[in-house]
Amino acid sequence: MKPTTFAIRGTVCFSTDSQNLTCLENAFIVCQDGRTAGVFPELPAQFEGIPVEDVGDQLIIPGMNDLHLHAPQYAFHGMYMDLELLEWLNQVTFPEEARYADLSYAEKAYSIFAEDLRQSATTRASIFATLHVEATELLMDLMEKTGLKTYIGKVNMDRNGTADLQEKSAVVSAGDTVRWLTDTAGKYENVKPILTPRFTPSCTDELMNALAELQRTYRLPVQSHLSENQSEIAWVHELCPNTSFYGEAYDQFGLFGSPDCPAIMAHCVYSSEAEIALMKKRGVFVAHCPQSNTNLSSGIAPVRRYLEEDLHIGLGTDIAGGHSLSMLRAIADAIQVSKLRWRLVDDSLKPLSLEEAFYMATMGGGAFFGKVGTFLEGYEFDALILDDRGLRHPQPLTARERLERLIYLSDDRCITGKYVSGNKIF
């Protein structure tokens, strides 16, 4: 039987809020029944005799929470980066996602994705599948086995797709969604369903009404896209002339989040003042996707503004608009693009600090999953052990310096251990 209480000793780094990063060398972090019991300079007497894993000088940090990625697109990540969003969807993404009607192809592709995500810095994620029920259930089966905690959504789209990737009607789309929810109810320990209208241009009002009814019935969170690209925003305005901004296209159906059933909205590059106010009112989680926003020439989201407004905000890799599964890379990308926005767009919004971007990847995005993303007492014990011995330096570095260097210079090969809710993944 696995021990319900154990400790790991090493150099521990974690956020306490968006501005503060705690770093403790030679510290003990105690996990009890899957949650953090505390971080201590010495092991308290009450925990005397528990198993202790000593990782030496390696870094111990919270697991990363990826708020936005597309599993079927992993098959072409790192390719076709010379297109903007709408062209990229029609020429590359939709044809690839159509292949997942073939379960043998889906199994090959999703098996690669699931294993690579297991080996990555990500411990929790909110994932788009495709509109295919069977392939989505296959992805859920594979992700369950990884031990990672994920939300996975069967995509809904009944317009503006392609002949091979579009549901026949709102009735068919809603019916398939009910079948998927029924098939998977109570089946998983690690995987949960999330309603996934692809984005407003892909969903008729009839479908959005049906999804709103399902949301109320099943009490499910929602994930979608918001204000990613200027052409997309103009298209939404044409499709929904009764709305004054993109977010209202979701909110009019009750699909823009609530305190007990939050919504993740990816990108939010061009959100208006009114949209930001509604996002704050509804408790929307912004999934900032800096790499994708760069690759698809979408723009740079005003993340500093969202932090100042105290919006919920985390990071997303947005595979395959983003080319890397690494959430460490996403942290560095978020900092870098914020500097460009400050220099080129709006010098009133200062760049992100390391503390802020690290918080977004851990505690900020982790809040979507509950008490997740830090080593404060009572939070679920999701952890990474990072070995930076391959990065040589002529003099000793502080723990913060080592963490920053790993974020900028490492890849996932530096990860020597991974825990989710106290369970050791590797």
Specify the residue positions occupied by each region the protein language model found.
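N-terminal metal-binding scaffold of metallo-dependent hydrolase/deaminase domains
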Residues: 1-47
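Divalent metal-coordination and catalytic microenvironments
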Residues: 11, 29, 34, 57, ...
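C-terminal cap of metal-dependent C-N hydrolases
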Residues: 15-17, 380-426
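Alpha-helical scaffold segments that flank or form the walls of functional sites
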Residues: 30, 77-148, 173-187
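Active-site gating loops and adjacent loop-to-helix segments of metal-dependent hydrolytic enzymes
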Residues: 77-108, 159-171, 229-260, 333-352
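Metal-coordinating catalytic core of metallo-dependent amide/deamination hydrolases
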Residues: 139-269
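His/Asp/Glu-enriched, well-ordered alpha-helical/loop segment
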Residues: 245, 252-259, 304-392
